[in-house]
Amino acid sequence: MLFRSDLANIEGVRQNQLIGYGLVVGLNGTGDTLNNIPFTKQSLQAMLERMGVNIRGATIRTGNVAAVMVTGNLPAFGTQGTRMDVTVSALGDAKNLQGGTLLVTPLLGADGNVYAVAQGSLAISGFQAEGEAAKIVRGVPTVGRIANGAIIEREIEFALNRLPNVRLALRNADFTTAKRIAAAVNDLDRKSVV
């Protein structure tokens, strides 16, 4: 019998939400206003200093950077080295993330540990265009996705074979489906499984 995930979920097997703070660069003037958003300026300074560039005391004027929150779902049984999608959302006053690249961003679980690292070019579904007399915004240009944009660095241990019992939670609970699944499990238990 193959497990049909459209019928039931195995209790305890689930995705885990991850979150991180990062910078998107290459925004062609649509990023954060550094005078209004101090955390973007501080993050940019800290990142450049880690790379050996000292800009303390210098006046930074760039609209090409935005502070962002990065979120993703670590899949159940996600293994180290595999990739997952992430969503990138502007945190400051950036107008548009189109054309931006997310710099290396650690993604943390609720326990504070790093489980994945994200980086890459954003795909934006929204857009913004403006002229002298009008401005048009469609969708949400301050939110984007990076398909396969994070690499899983740490796995969440879940030893299904060490559980004393495995519980199934039916997606659409009804007596007939429950009875059929119970019969299939009991039949499997009687057979020699290799």
Predicted regions and their residues:
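Short, small-residue-biased leader/transition segments that mark boundaries at the very start
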Residues: 1-2
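N-terminal targeting signals for Sec/Tat export/insertion, comprising classic cleavable signal peptides
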Residues: 7-30
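Signal for well-folded cores of large energy- and translation-related assemblies
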Residues: 8, 12, 49-52, 186-190
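Signal peptide-directed extracytoplasmic domains
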Residues: 19-21, 30-161
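A generic structural motif
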Residues: 28-31, 74, 169-174
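Phosphate-binding glycine-rich loops and their immediate beta-loop-alpha structural context
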Residues: 137-192
